[in-house]
Structures are given as structure tokens and as C-alpha cells.
Curated annotation (Swiss-Prot):
GO terms for molecular function: dolichyl pyrophosphate Glc1Man9GlcNAc2 alpha-1,3-glucosyltransferase activity; dolichyl-phosphate-glucose-glycolipid alpha-glucosyltransferase activity. Pathway: Protein modification; protein glycosylation. It comes from the Eukaryota. It comes from Homo sapiens (Human). PANTHER family: DOLICHYL GLYCOSYLTRANSFERASE, DOLICHYL PYROPHOSPHATE GLC1MAN9GLCNAC2 ALPHA-1,3-GLUCOSYLTRANSFERASE-RELATED. InterPro entries: Glyco_trans_ALG6/ALG8. Belongs to the ALG6/ALG8 glucosyltransferase family. This is Dolichyl pyrophosphate Glc1Man9GlcNAc2 alpha-1,3-glucosyltransferase. Keywords: Congenital disorder of glycosylation, Disease variant, Endoplasmic reticulum, Glycosyltransferase, Membrane, Transferase, Transmembrane, Transmembrane helix. It is found in: Endoplasmic reticulum membrane. It is linked to Congenital disorder of glycosylation 1H: A form of congenital disorder of glycosylation, a multisystem disorder caused by a defect in glycoprotein biosynthesis and characterized by under-glycosylated serum glycoproteins. Congenital disorders of glycosylation result in a wide variety of clinical features, such as defects in the nervous system development, psychomotor retardation, dysmorphic features, hypotonia, coagulation disorders, and immunodeficiency. Polycystic liver disease 3 with or without kidney cysts: A form of polycystic liver disease, an autosomal dominant hepatobiliary disease characterized by overgrowth of biliary epithelium and supportive connective tissue, resulting in multiple liver cysts. PCLD3 patients may also develop kidney cysts that usually do not result in clinically significant renal disease. The gene is ALG8. Its EC number is 2.4.1.265. GO terms for cellular component: endoplasmic reticulum membrane; lumenal side of endoplasmic reticulum membrane.
Length: 526
């Protein structure tokens, strides 16, 4: 707090927040890391040791390169720094290699790349409406947003304990959003195009970008009622946008097109042979669907409606990533999830087209695209919830309704990440960090909107408080029961299903809010 006090007086409070979280990241260096640590070490080795023609074919390790080319080049650049730390980490055949120098290099590379995220957060803070400015520094929307983003619990544990490089990728996304708020549309489009070629999961929010840029940049004027003035369409602008996307894509995919390897690259990026859900079900609609199928199958067996010999052998809770058949409900195909996702996204896209509401409307649409894809996508990872939580953070300091949705989404979504850290030493760390972040989020947003109605109703409060007993049950009670051996998947099942309820509720509540705002806007115009 001393650093923050000094920073308040000099106006450098943002630097103090950034420095503080960086020190925390350094303290987390010795903690547990997941298999993703080996994944990225292997990618360093592949890009450093092999010619580009072999990058997307190399399969010595099961952790093959399955990110777009820009990320592969990023690993290539890192590898030329890594060789000064430990040359052995760059050997393709050194599977599961993890020396102390390798650990330090990979951990510090994540921390260093977060510089882009810090800069993007600063740019986003410049876009925040300053109407609700409190007397105290800690009550200012910009300060609250800075803490919500820089100290985001999910990003901390996923990148700096579990191990991934999400920080600088989200930095690109937030910087792109900031540029659109600043009406620097070409820069925003360029940054997002670059981002897509770093990690293709951001395709989930591409519809929001495409529609917003077409509606608000390529059409230069509206009619008095807010509808499109078709004659204002600018061919120059749409060609400029197309050229930006084309050039970025050509730079990324061009070398592999020249090598006639695009089919191989895309087969790595989109492995549809994986199952509907990850080993640990992401808390989405399909988790509820799978749970219902399990319940119906148990009831069917008890009532002898089902033949035990006809029950599929592949278990959805076995911890294996595989395809499986549902027992009672219809099995779900990749095409079915795509259709469900498109149907879920369309209403928000229509609202953005017919009632743009400026950059804020774009941001709400982007969040809904991210959430809808999380809810209905194929083989969704639990970490993908951050794609909705981070942009929702920007909305949370603007309106009380959005703050309420954000708190439900972020608390539930962050808790759903707990199974990523399953080792005993990390248990107190994840509980303490989440408690601190959650308490701060709720208290700061309640203070910001203290003149408005309470952020939670009794049902929402009861649900969020239920996460406490759930954690006690899963971590401290279940391990001492006889069910631990026979039903080891129950804690994961309970966590996934319970969190799926909260995330589904937040998604539905945000959708209702967007549709109502759109309808009210049309009524006012009339």
C-alpha cells in the first residue's frame, strides 16, 4: 500500500499496479506447471531445430504444433533467446525436459510479454467514460478497471502457474478494442487480423469485428432514425479493410501455401476428431447436456429401460480426450455445435447491425459472441471463459446492470478454473488469490454504483455463496469418502455443472439486457 500511496501523489498509480502484479508473477515462478509447459518447450525445439517445411508435420512428441503461423514464428524468435539459457531445451528428442534454467526462461518469457497487456490496459483506461468519478482514487472507474484487468485472477493462474501465453494475446485484443473506441478503425482491424494468426480461438469474436467495421466504418452516415444510409457506403474503406486482412493472412499463410502445406496446417488448427468436451467439461451448455444424459442413463438402468451391454464404453468423465456416444440423448456432432453457436450469435449480430450503439454496443456484441461460442462450441477448454471475462471487465465500470453480470460471470468462471491447479501446494494460493480478487471486485463495483439498486438479488447471492460449500465438499470432504476410488470424477462433475448454471445465467442475462436496450433505442427513435 505504501507504493500505491506514493503513486497517488505523483500520478503514477497505474505503474504501481503494474509493478505490483509483476512482482507477484515473479513469486509464482516456482509453482506447479501443467503439460502446457512441455508443449511450449517442444514448440521452441521444433521451430528452432527444424526447417519451416517440417513444423506442422513434426510428431515426435504428442504435443504437436497446433497454433497459427504467427505463434510459430513467435516461438522461433523466443528459441534464439532460449539457447543462451539452456541449449538442451531446444532438442526435439528431449521430451519432458525441464531444467531450472528452462523453467526460468519460460516463466520470464511470459512475464516479459505481458508488457503488451499492460500497455493495452492503459489504452483501454483512456476510453472509459469519466462521468462517475469518485473523490478517492480507488473509487475512480479507471482505477477499478486497471485492477480488474491487471490483477485478473484467471489470467494470473492460467499464465503464471498453469503456464500459457494468454497475456500478450489478450493485450492485442484489448489494444484492438481501444483503437476502435478511439475511432482508429484501420489500426483496430490490423491488430485483430494479426491476433487471429497468433491464436485462432479469437475467431469466436470475429463476427462482431466484421459487422461493426462494415456497419460503422464502411458506411459513413446514418439516417435520422438510426438506420443505414445506403448511399454512404465507401468502397475505398471496404477495399482498405480487405487489403489489411489479405496482407496479414498472406504474410502468415503465404510460406505454407508456397509449400503446398495449407491442408496440413488447417488439420492441426482444427482437430475435429477430438470429443465434444475436454477431459474436464468446460462449464457450458454441453456440460449440462452431458450431465442430463448421465442422469437419464442411470435412471434408465435402474428402471431396466436400458441394456447395460449397450452403454457406450467411452466415459465422458474418464479424463480422456476422445469421441464418445451419448446414452439417452442424441449424440452431438461438430456441425451441430456450429449451428447452435451461429444461432446463439445471430441476435447479437442483428442488434449490432440495426442498432449499433457505438463502440460500447460492439463490445457487448463481442462479449456475447465469446460467451455464445463458449456455451455451444466444440471441444471448448475451460480457459476460454477468459475470452468473455476480460472484455466484460470494460463494460462493468459503465453500467450497474453490466457490473452485476460481470460479477456473476467472473466469480463463477474463475472458480471453474480451480481444477487446473490440482496439486496441494497451490490449493491455498488459488483460494487466497480468488478470494482477494472477488472481494475487491464486488466491493469496488458496489461502491461505484452505490446510488443505484443492489447488484445482486437474493437468488444470485445464494448461488454465489454456494461456491464456498462446493469447494469444501470437493477439496476437503470428498477425498475422505469411499466414493473417491469408485467415482473419482464427481468433484469435476459437480464443479462443471454448478459453474455451468451460473455462466448460462450470466449469458442469458446479458442477452436480455442487450435485446431490451436495442428495443428501447428503437422506441425512442420512433
Amino acid at each position: 500500500m505504501a507504493a500505491l500511496t506514493i503513486a497517488t501523489g505523483t500520478g503514477n498509480w497505474f505503474s504501481a499496479l503494474a509493478l505490483g502484479v509483476t512482482l507477484l508473477k515473479c513469486l509464482l515462478i516456482p509453482t506447479y506447471h501443467s503439460t502446457d509447459f512441455e508443449v511450449h518447450r517442444n514448440w521452441l525445439a521444433i521451430t528452432h531445430s527444424l526447417p519451416i517445411s517440417q513444423w506442422y508435420y513434426e510428431a515426435t512428441s504428442e504435443w504437436t504444433l497446433d497454433y497459427p503461423p504467427f505463434f510459430a514464428w513467435f516461438e522461433y524468435i523466443l528459441s534464439h533467446v532460449a539457447k543462451y539459457f539452456d541449449q538442451e531445451m531446444l532438442n526435439v528428442h528431449n521430451l519432458n525436459y525441464s531444467s531450472s534454467r528452462t523453467l526460468l526462461f519460460q516463466r520470464f518469457s511470459v512475464i516479459f510479454m505481458d508488457v503488451l497487456f499492460v500497455y493495452a490496459v492503459r489504452e483501454c483506461c483512456k476510453c472509459i467514460d469519466g462521468k462517475k468519478v469518485g473523490k478517492e482514487l480507488t473509487e475512480k472507474p479507471k482505477f477499478i478497471l486497471s485492477v480488474l484487468l491487471l490483477w485478473n485472477f484467471g489470467l494470473l493462474i492460467v499464465d503464471h502457474i498453469h503456464f500459457q501465453y494468454n497475456g500478450f494475446l489478450f493485450g492485442l485484443m484489448l489494444l484492438s478494442i481501444a483503437r476502435l473506441f478511439q475511432k482508429r478503425h484501420m489500426e483496430g482491424a490490423f491488430l485483430f487480423a494479426v491476433l487471429l494468426h497468433f491464436k485462432h480461438i479469437y475467431l469466436y469474436v470475429a463476427p462482431a469485428y466484421g459487422v461493426y467495421l462494415l456497419r460503422s466504418y464502411c458506411f459513413t452516415a446514418n439516417k435520422p432514425d438510426g438506420s443505414i444510409r445506403w448511399k454512404s457506403f465507401s468502397f475505398v474503406r471496404v477495399i482498405s479493410l480487405g487489403l489489411v486482412v489479405f496482407l496479414v493472412s498472406a504474410l502468415s499463410l503465404g510460406p505454407f501455401l508456397a509449400l503446398n502445406q495449407l491442408p496440413q496446417v488447417f488439420s492441426r488448427l482444427f482437430p475435429f476428431k477430438r470429443g465434444l468436451c475436454h477431459a474436464y467439461w468446460a462449464p457450458n451448455f454441453w456440460a449440462l447436456y452431458n450431465a442430463l444424459d448421465k442422469v437419464l442413463s442411470v435412471i434408465g438402468l435402474k428402471l431396466k429401460f436400458l441394456d447395460p451391454n449397450n452403454i457406450p464404453k467411452a466415459s465422458m468423465t474418464s479424463g480422456l480426450v476422445q469421441q464418445f456416444q451419448h446414452t439417452v440423448l442424441p449424440s452431438v456432432t461438430p456441425l451441430a455445435t456450429l449451428i447452435c453457436t451461429l444461432i446463439a450469435i445471430l441476435p447479437s449480430i442483428f442488434c449490432l447491425w440495426f442498432k449499433p450503439q457505438g463502440p460500447r454496443g460492439f463490445l457487448r456484441c463481442l462479449t456475447l459472441c465469446a460467451l455464445s461460442s463458449f456455451m455451444f462450441g466444440w471441444h471448448v477448454h475451460e480457459k476460454a471463459i477468459l475470452l468473455a471475462i476480460l472484455p466484460m471487465s470494460l463494460l462493468s465500470v459503465g453500467k450497474a446492470g453490466d457490473a452485476s453480470i460481470f460479477l456473476i460471470l467472473t466469480t463463477t468462471g474463475h472458480y471453474s478454473l480451480f481444477p487446473l491447479l490440482f496439486t496441494a501446494p497451490e490449493l491455498p494460493i488459488k483460494i487466497l488469490l480468488m478470494l482477494l480478487f472477488t472481494i475487491y471486485s464486488i466491493s469496488s463495483l458496489k461502491t461505484l454504483f452505490r446510488k443505484e439498486k443492489p447488484l445482486f438479488n437474493w437468488m444470485e447471492t445464494f448461488y454465489l455463496l454456494g461456491l464456498g460449500p462446493l469447494e469444501v465438499c470437493c477439496e476437503f470432504v470428498f477425498p475422505f469418502t469411499s466414493w473417491k476410488v469408485k467415482y473419482p470424477f464427481i468433484p469435476l462433475l459437480l464443479t462443471s455443472v454448478y459453474c455451468a448454471v451460473g455462466i448460462t445465467y450470466a449469458w442469458f442475462k446479458l442477452y436480455v439486457s442487450v435485446l431490451i436496450d436495442s428495443a428501447i433505442g428503437k422506441t425512442k427513435k420512433q
